[in-house]
Amino acid sequence: MEISEKQIEKYLVKKIKAEKGLCLKFESPGYTGVPDRIIILKNKPVAFVELKRPVGGRYSARQKLVERDFNRLGQKVYKVKNKEEVDKLVEELI
């Protein structure tokens, strides 16, 4: 059975909370295409995460543009589409 984006998101939140961090939903009225989550861990850089379902999850043109804007400002947008990628991301961030 295919895992949903929502299930991946819940897993990410759980993993970050286990590290005593915050995994905040990122919504920006008036500025579309922002990443889904902001991760804040003690004494670590802030991380922005875009989640997609494993099969058929596609990034919109607007999301790609926003990612370029973030990169231009020295910020990385992490993209994850399954639990294994969440695990790798958490290991990288901690």
Regions found by a protein language model. Name each.
Residues 1-94:
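Catalytic phosphate/metal-binding cores of nucleic-acid and nucleotide-processing enzymes, i.e., regions
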